[in-house]
Amino acid sequence: MKIKYFGTAAYEGIPALFCQCESCRRALALGGKNLRTRAQALIDDEVLVDFNADTVAHYQKYKFDWTKIKYCLITHSHSDHFYPRDLSMFVGRYYTHNVSHIDFYGGKSVYDKIEEIIHDESLCPDPTRLTATEVKPGDLLTLNGYKVVAADADHDPE
């Protein structure tokens, strides 16, 4: 199994936008591996973990092949893991060409948002480009030989 980590930071990234703390200033000065984008990973070129606002930057930097990605697992609905606004580029008629179908998996709020996009003809003229599957904690998914167990993500202090 080959896992590529594109981003390993939380919502704010490192350095955080607007932040002038010592850690952020140091990361900016050092650059390279010290600059961290929002969490995202790719497994064996076909399973994307999370779809956040840094996805386009990750694509531009790491040049992964979108046509090989068959599945996208959304760990939870916070915007640093799921940024549905960019899905309009995937399903829109003007932004992308020659794309492959991707199956998205996520909790109820992720599922509901993707279904909303799929059923909005102004956003999604071609709903065959993606499907959404709702998963619950404890569900076992089998995706082309991968076995994935859905776990509850609860890290919000509120």
Region spans (language model):
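Binuclear metal-dependent hydrolase catalytic cores
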Residues: 1-158
